[in-house]
Amino acid sequence: GASEEEDVDLSDILAGVDEGDVEVSETVGSQEPVDLEAQAGESPVIRYVNYIIQQAVKEGASDIHIEPAEKKLKVRFRIDGMLFESMNPPAGMSAAIASRLKIMANLDISERRVPQDGRIRCTVAGRKLDLRVSTLPCGYGEKVVMRILDTRSIQVELDQLGFGTNTLEVWKAQVKNPHGIVLVTGPTGSGKTTTLYASLRVIDKNKLNISTVEDPVEYHMEGITQTQTHERIGMTFAKALKALLRQDPDVIMLGEIRDHETAHTAVQAALTGHLVLSTLHTNDAPSSVTRLVNIGLEPFLVGAALNGVLAQRLVRRLCEHCKCEEMPSEEMREYLGMQGLPCESMWVGKGCDRCRSTGYAGRLGIYELLAVDDQLRDVIARNPNVSEFRRMCLERGMTSLRQDGLKKASKGQTSIQEILRVTESSI
């Protein structure tokens, strides 16, 4: 990274950057993409912004943070869930870079006092990308954060996400059920959307009517009707869902269950012969049941409608080029022994040029799948205490997030340290 260097000489960097490298589909007045290359006499700012986006894509970043400080401007990329400082343009470019990004995202360039949100559609190295742009006024100007939505990353299949064979089979059966609710749960950025889209792909869209309600529609999928919510004009999740139910749907994907009205409508849909897939923000699978009851649903309805809950996290994958086995500490050996895992050696990433000296490259999912059977339906109907319910699920063979992660660490897919970092001891 450039974190140790002084302000860089732009002309050196920009020598190799062409205006056409990032082709922005500007939507000014019309939907016709405007090729930036055609706009002659480009200023260094335009080229530098192109350079930032290009570098981020090249390094596999999911987000770009442009952060003005008193005497410097920091550009950080989020790679595999971690932020890395990537470049330090001159502090004086802060306003110009923010303005350029606002123009690209069709935002109000003169408004610097309130946050703004927009989106940039562009092509980088032949790849079509969507950048979600968010600006925020702060002490030294405006901070700009961009989320890179790469349509390729969402085209992964279920069996590429890191599921164990058994979990994968059970989950596929869940999403092929003709009716009921199937949930994916986890914090923001844990890969829920990717799992939902991959799950929709195993359903036969030629024979079934599949519809989604999302906020916003992140990726467009062929053969599926996708609807975006607009809270400001009253197009809420609940309202969109009610409208969808009049469209003779078979499968409905809801971006998120946020409130009682949406939850209630989703349950009614599930109980009247529709399959509903959605997400929640809970730490583990069993606590999703409690969350639905807390939203205001009757426990017996939750028990009747719920088919399965998949809790997930993303963990960093060990770099294939520098991973190796080493002897665990005494304390770690004891811990591994208690978990019933091999304790003579453990996998670690040494760090090399290929992985920015982190020891990790790429990510995979760890999962906890709760499949609801008749016995559990009866338990849920009695509104169990959450820790008691969790204990019961584990006793009946549910693999916890941490157990799934430790299994993957013992196979050398990730490290034990990474699993302990991402999961809480209770899960």
Model-derived features: positions:
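Cytosolic catalytic headpiece of P-type ATPases
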Residues: 143-144, 265, 363-368
